[in-house]
C-alpha cells in the first residue's frame, strides 16, 4: 500500500494496517492526522441508521453534562463577544443548541442528515460549534474552511473530538475508532496545523478533546 496525501497538511501519510478489522488507515507523522481508507467509509444510509441508535436527548444526563462542560470550557470564557451561534452537525437531537438558547444566545442548527436546510449561506456567526463532528468528516480541512467563511471577523470555532493516542499500537487498541462512522482522528498538533493553513488563531487546545480557534479580524 502506497502513502496517501495528508488531507490536512499535504505531506505523505503512511499506511497503517489494522489486523483486527482488516482495513487500512493512513497516518501523517507531520501533523498527526489519521484517516481511514476511503473505500471503507460507510454509506450515508448506514451512517444515518447508526446515528439514530444514539441516545442524544435532554433526558440523557450524561450527554447533557458533557455539553455543560463543553460550554464552560470553550464558550463562557468568550461569551461577551458572542451573540449569534451555529451548532454545526447537531444530530437528530440538538441538545447543545437548546442549552445555549437557555443562556440567551441566538442559535441556528445544521446537520447534513437531520437538519439539512436550516443553514443560510448568507448568514455569519460569532461562534460555530462542532461537537463530536470532526471524527465523521471525510475532508476536515475543507469543512473547517467552510465554517471559517461563515464566521464574523474574530468569530470563534469551538471543536470537540477525542484526540487519538498517537502510537500505532495504542491507536489499534483505541475504543473510539471502533465506531464505523469515525473516519478522521486528530491530535492537538493537527489542529495547530489546520489553524495555520486557514488563518485561524488558536485560543485554546487541551490534551483530551477540545480546540478553540478564532478567525482573523479585518
Question: In which residue ranges do the predicted regions lie?
Answer:
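A short His-aromatic
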Residues: 132, 136
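Conserved beta-strand signature within the Rossmann-like core of class I S-adenosyl-L-methionine
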Residues: 155-162
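Short "lid" loop at the C-terminus of a central beta-strand within the Rossmann-like core
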Residues: 162-167, 184
Amino acid at each position: 500500500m502506497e502513502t496517501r496525501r495528508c488531507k490536512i497538511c499535504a505531506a505523505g501519510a503512511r499506511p497503517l494496517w489494522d489486523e483486527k478489522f482488516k482495513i487500512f488507515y493512513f497516518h501523517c507523522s507531520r501533523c498527526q492526522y489519521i484517516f481511514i481508507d476511503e473505500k471503507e467509509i460507510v454509506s450515508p444510509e448506514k451512517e444515518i441508521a447508526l446515528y439514530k441508535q444514539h441516545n442524544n436527548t435532554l433526558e440523557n444526563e450524561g450527554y447533557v453534562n458533557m455539553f455543560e462542560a463543553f460550554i464552560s470550557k470553550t464558550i463562557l470564557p468568550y461569551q461577551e463577544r458572542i451573540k449569534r451561534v451555529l451548532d454545526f452537525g447537531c444530530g437528530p437531537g440538538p441538545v447543545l443548541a437548546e442549552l445555549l438558547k437557555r443562556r440567551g444566545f441566538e442559535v441556528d442548527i445544521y446537520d447534513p442528515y437531520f437538519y439539512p436546510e436550516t443553514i443560510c449561506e448568507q448568514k455569519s456567526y460569532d461562534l460555530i460549534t462542532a461537537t463530536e463532528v470532526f471524527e465523521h468528516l471525510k475532508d476536515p480541512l475543507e469543512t473547517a474552511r467552510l465554517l471559517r467563511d461563515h464566521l464574523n471577523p474574530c468569530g470563534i470555532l469551538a471543536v470537540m473530538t477525542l484526540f487519538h493516542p498517537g502510537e500505532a499500537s495504542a491507536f489499534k487498541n483505541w475504543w473510539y475508532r471502533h465506531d464505523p462512522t469515525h473516519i478522521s482522528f486528530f491530535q492537538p498538533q493537527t489542529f495547530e496545523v489546520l489553524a495555520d493553513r486557514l488563518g485561524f488563531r488558536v485560543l485554546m487546545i487541551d490534551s483530551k478533546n477540545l480546540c478553540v480557534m478564532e478567525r482573523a479580524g479585518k
